[in-house]
Regions:
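Extracellular/lumenal and peripheral-membrane lipid-interaction modules
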Residues: 2-253
Length: 253
């Protein structure tokens, strides 16, 4: 009886204690912010405004270059993108953000993009973070590998993100197919050549380095090859490598 009573006391005291610890760990994991996101939110307003203006100027110059025949290229920095996200997006393009999401920021690392934003869930708020690896399979064929999605440190299902990608490509009338790499879903999006006064746009290079995103291509005149030249003449997309993303630890995600 004494042993049973002691066991019951331990259970009565231990179960609530374990529950409190588990709840505390869950709360800590739910509210954990990626290091890059905390740093981005601490950027001074003047720096953000300057970055936003730089991005808008470079984007305008890129559009002008694309409209001319010949090669074009541009380089955008994470500071410029975050400046635009902080200043111009909420002011002039707030409808682009899904309801409940705010303060988006990005980090550019070699070969990958980290995106994070705040999301209110009832009385609580968390930081959602997504890691993607975008690259070109061939000119005008963009692959986006969705590596992970988290709320704090807690992994989230990828299905809602895949549905958002499918919806966005449908709205933009861009062909989409799905592939896999290392168990991760890969969205393969065909960027249809734009025809404007006989000019055709070809996106030929996309590189992501630490803090920088580089894009380049060519604008040509004349006819573009048929969209379906046949299985023999169509270029074959390379086989996707089953490569796992580099692991920088939970704080980097």
């Amino acid at each position: 009886m004494r042993g049973i009573s002691r066991r019951m006391v331990l259970l009565v005291l231990g179960v609530p204690a374990v529950g409190v610890v588990a709840a505390g760990l869950a709360y800590f994991a739910w509210n954990r912010e990626p290091a890059f996101y905390r740093a981005a939110l601490e950027t001074e307003a003047a720096t953000l405004a300057h970055g936003s203006n730089e991005l808008l100027e470079q984007a305008s110059a890129l559009v002008t270059d694309i409209r001319r025949q010949g090669e074009w290229r541009s380089l955008f920095t994470a500071n410029q993108i975050n400046g635009w996200l902080a200043c111009d997006l909420p002011k002039n393009h707030a409808s682009l953000l899904p309801p409940g999401l705010e303060q988006p920021r990005v980090a550019l690392e070699k070969g990958r993009i980290l995106v994070a934003c705040r999301r209110a869930v009832g009385p609580m708020a968390t930081v959602m973070a997504i890691e993607v690896e975008p690259y070109l399979l061939q000119p005008n064929e963009l692959a986006v590998r969705i590596c992970s999605a988290r709320a704090g440190w807690i992994p989230l299902p990828l299905e809602p993100i895949l549905q958002q990608i499918a919806h966005a490509t449908t709205e933009a009338e861009l062909p989409l197919r799905w592939d896999q790499a290392g168990g991760d879903p890969v969205a393969v999006i065909t960027l249809e050549p734009r025809r404007d006064d006989q000019r055709v746009l070809s996106v030929e290079s996309l590189e992501i380095q630490a803090g920088e995103l580089y894009v380049a291509g060519t604008t040509r005149t004349g006819d573009w090859p048929s969209a379906d030249p046949g299985p023999d003449s169509a270029p074959k997309p390379p086989v996707l490598e089953a490569r796992l993303p580099e692991d920088d630890g939970p704080a980097a995600r």
